[in-house]
């Protein structure tokens, strides 16, 4: 079980809604993933009350919606988007994203912290997308964020846990859930994050652009389950030198045989 704010999740796979070929395919993949928390960009939602091709299927699916502020370049823009989401969708949960750099989509740490402090004071459950910076993650935690979401690699890059060393520190120090977000491109990456001690991962591109998104969603679901089981079982410590599982020295000395 994973507890974030007032909600308990049985799935540790969080998913996104972008890049799917069709809304139907998106819905099928999300169902196959078993995800209970789905993020969506407010800029892609029809707030005029029409038949929204993204929002309506998600509401039918019964998952918790996590509107994000993707597209915001400043704290002020992100706060405005979060307030709009709360008014339109009736949720006080928000994934805080502020990335003014359009090439690498790296989060702005200063604006992110500034927006987080404002939104927490307004009663939002804030899950900030941020760089894998242990100091920043601790500051976001102290500001009242319900979780932190450090990147594994740039958004959509599918490059895996390029920030592994820093993720280890973040996980070690965190007193709130750590959700590895961005860069996870294969089920093995998600498994690695769980073995590191992450509480969950968020995956979008790797599922949406797969040749078979539904099967890929199932693969990620199984990887997360395997990673959690492995962590609960207790992974063996790594060794620099070889350690034989069945020492043969005594056995050979007792035989007394020579060639």
Curated annotation (Swiss-Prot):
Pathway: Cofactor biosynthesis; thiamine diphosphate biosynthesis
One matching Pfam family: ThiG
Matches recorded under PANTHER family: THIAZOLE SYNTHASE
Catalytic activity field: [ThiS sulfur-carrier protein]-C-terminal-Gly-aminoethanethioate + 2-iminoacetate + 1-deoxy-D-xylulose 5-phosphate = [ThiS sulfur-carrier protein]-C-terminal Gly-Gly + 2-[(2R,5Z)-2-carboxy-4-methylthiazol-5(2H)-ylidene]ethyl phosphate + 2 H2O + H(+)
InterPro entries membership: Aldolase_TIM (IPR013785), Thiazole_synthase_ThiG (IPR033983), ThiG (IPR008867)
Catalytic residue list: 95 (schiff-base intermediate with dxp)
Subcellular location: Cytoplasm
SUPFAM superfamilies: ThiG-like
Family per similarity comment: Belongs to the ThiG family.
Function: Catalyzes the rearrangement of 1-deoxy-D-xylulose 5-phosphate (DXP) to produce the thiazole phosphate moiety of thiamine. Sulfur is provided by the thiocarboxylate moiety of the carrier protein ThiS. In vitro, sulfur can be provided by H(2)S.
Molecular function GO terms recorded: thiazole synthase activity
Gene: thiG
Keywords carried by this UniProt record: Cytoplasm, Schiff base, Thiamine biosynthesis, Transferase
Superkingdom, taxonomy of origin: Bacteria
HAMAP family in the cross-refs: ThiG
Binding site for 1-deoxy-D-xylulose 5-phosphate: 156, 182-183, 204-205
GO CC entries: cytoplasm
Quaternary context: Homotetramer. Forms heterodimers with either ThiH or ThiS.
Enzyme Commission number(s) of this protein: 2.8.1.10
GO biological process assignments: thiamine diphosphate biosynthetic process
Name this protein carries in UniProt: Thiazole synthase
